């Protein structure tokens, strides 16, 4: 009985998108102040490149917008992330 309850709760939590680890992410914002749009849901190369521009290693398309896992609030805006990770820039 306990195993069935555990499995049911695990599936329920995964379907609702809740994270038990607390490792959340954010939607990155481009230089024009917009979220990056994407057409192919799930993992795709475009969102992965966008997330790398914002300083994180993992991202995917969620509700037709790129979502980056572990993206900190300070790196959501493109130019803020650019200043943080591109030390040789003059912006």
From Swiss-Prot:
- Role, per record: The heterodimer LVP1 induces lipolysis in rat adipocytes. Induction of lipolysis by LVP1 appears to be mediated through the beta-2 adrenergic receptor pathway (ADRB2).
Among the entry's GO cellular component annotations, what is one?
extracellular region
Keywords of this entry: Disulfide bond, G-protein coupled receptor impairing toxin, Ion channel impairing toxin, Neurotoxin, Secreted, Signal, Toxin
Q: Which PROSITE patterns match?
A: LCN_CSAB
In which family does this protein belong, per the annotation? Belongs to the long (3 C-C) scorpion toxin superfamily.
**Disulfide bond entries:** 38-61, 47-66, 51-68
Q: What is known of its domains?
A: Has the structural arrangement of an alpha-helix connected to antiparallel beta-sheets by disulfide bonds (CS-alpha/beta).
Output this protein's name: Lipolysis-activating peptide 1-alpha chain
Lineage: superkingdom = Eukaryota
The principal location of this protein is: secreted
Q: How does it assemble?
A: Heterodimer of this alpha chain and a beta chain (AC D9U2A2).
Which Gene Ontology terms cover its molecular function? sodium channel inhibitor activity; toxin activity
* CDD domains hit by this protein: neurotoxins_LC_scorpion
Q: Which InterPro entries match?
A: LCN-type_CS_alpha_beta_dom, Scorpion_toxin-like_sf, Scorpion_toxinL/defensin
Q: Which organism is it from?
A: Lychas mucronatus
Signal sequence span is 1-21
* Localization (cell): Secreted
Describe, from its UniProt entry, the tissues in which this protein is expressed.
Answer: Expressed by the venom gland.
Looking at the record, the residues that make up the LCN-type CS-alpha/beta domain are 23-87
């Amino acid at each position: 009985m306990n195993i069935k309850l555990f499995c049911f709760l695990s599936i329920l939590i995964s379907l609702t998108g809740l994270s038990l680890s607390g490792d959340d992410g954010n939607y990155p914002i481009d230089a024009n102040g917009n979220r990056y749009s994407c057409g192919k849901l799930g993992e795709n190369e475009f969102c992965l490149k966008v997330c790398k521009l914002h300083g994180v290693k993992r991202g995917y398309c969620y509700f037709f917008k790129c979502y980056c896992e572990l993206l900190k609030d300070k790196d959501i805006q493109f130019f803020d992330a650019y200043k943080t990770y591109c030390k040789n820039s003059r912006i």
